[in-house]
Amino acid sequence: MQNTPLKQRPLRRHLASLLVAGAAVALFPVAAWAQSTSAGEAPKVRLSTSMGDIVLELYPDKSPKTVENFLQYVRDKHYDGTVFHRVINNFMIQGGGFTADFQQKATRPSIPLEASNGLKNDRGTIAMARTQNPNSATAQFFINVVDNAALNAPNPDGYGYAVFGKVTAGMDVVDKIKLVPVGNQGMHQNVPKTPLTILKATLEK
């Protein structure tokens, strides 16, 4: 990631923040985003958060392994009680890995990267966070709050970040989350000063 030519240094710093926090700290215009999957077939997941509900439509035709992985974590209630632990306005909000007291949750084995699927890291899309190893995504995800072309395959490190769905309701909630005050907590940066909790993640269809 570090050798990718980017126009703005702040964005380069933000790219580093998409590393999945782990043992060593590991990462749209909604209505206009065209997809090949019909709305009737796409699974939907509701994230009930402490700031309101966010509904995600997922695309198993484009990112089959990523979607099944995410849905299994939902079925296992992995996300219930986790927080958005990294929030950067004009970039993304990231969650799915920690409880409010920053206890890291156990995960299943990592999945292969599916970033070259034609889906873009546009505003309102959801993608998997990972380490510098492209095939290291487990449970952590992020929602893009702006169009982040620098994250699309093969950028920023020759691989890109795998988009697997988009927000179809609750983008106003995402926009509230992106504006919360943040600070440092231990080795973690851009941590909301008040925990933003995913109370429950449920499969709607």
Predicted regions located by residue number:
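Cyclophilin-like peptidyl-prolyl cis-trans isomerases
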Residues: 2-10, 17, 22, 27-205
